[in-house]
Amino acid sequence: MAIPKIVLFYQFTPLADPEAIKLWQHSLAESNNLTGRIIVSPHGINATVGGDIEDVKRYVRGTRGYEPFRTADIKWSDGLGNDFPRLSVKARSEIVTFGAPDELKVDENGVVGGGVHLAPKELHELVDSRGDDVVFFDGRNAFEAEIGRFRDAVVPDVATTRDFVDELDSGKYDHLKGKAVVTYCTGGVRCEVLSSLMRSRGFDEVYQLDGGIVRYGETFGDRGLWDGSLYVFDKRMNIEFSSEAKTLGVCVDCGTPTPRYRNRIDGDGRTLELLCESCSPDLEQD
């Protein structure tokens, strides 16, 4: 019986030949019948792939067999079996598109000059000891935070990751430079870059949630500082860490609380919107 699983991971490490790594990763994933997205750059790898559990395990073993990726933190979750339409493996200038490839420096230990990594329990210790001096800073697109976020988090008004550089350079967050700023994102990769960009712009005390929201949810579920659902970039669209998850999103049509993002198809194409089951019962999620 097939057991669908999804793995999410990244590794910041210098790669001399991203094109060669791309070809190898495509062959490895394809030979194991996986679908999903893999991005390779001179800075490392960022991947989310899914398939049957045994196929995924073989892919993970093969990937970790390459020394620079040996310590990759693999995050597992349950899949649906058709979570991605195809396999996409690309070589780019960045594994997360902030539009600032020349600002990021990496070595064999990861990002140079990034924020201090905090495990979920260490995050709670920081909040307990520093109180209101700690500020959560969302490293995702603003729409993701509409269905879930850390309590009282700062949510930058960004539509894409590329918007963060201008957002930081605008000066609107300069009042946080004397605070303990904790960046967070889905699995951690965006905050690796964001925290380094913030530090280079004068934010002295910057942290990043190690393993991202995914690892935090695995540790504390809905009994901690996280409220709501987690947006994910596959056909699931959102996941919850327990049956006790709060519903923060609101249907744009009727105002019913909902965590469901769906593609509304109209004359202008597709628009991702919060739509409850009553208002979008039969929308196809391609």
Curated annotation (Swiss-Prot):
Boundaries of every Rhodanese domain copy: 130-225
Catalytically driven reaction(s): uridine(34) in tRNA + AH2 + O2 = 5-hydroxyuridine(34) in tRNA + A + H2O
SUPFAM superfamilies for this protein: Rhodanese/Cell cycle control phosphatase (SSF52821)
Keywords attached to this entry: Oxidoreductase, tRNA processing
GO terms, molecular function: oxidoreductase activity, acting on paired donors, with incorporation or reduction of molecular oxygen
Protein purpose: Catalyzes oxygen-dependent 5-hydroxyuridine (ho5U) modification at position 34 in tRNAs.
Family affiliation: Belongs to the TrhO family.
Name this protein carries in UniProt: tRNA uridine(34) hydroxylase
Organism annotation: Rhodococcus erythropolis (strain PR4 / NBRC 100887)
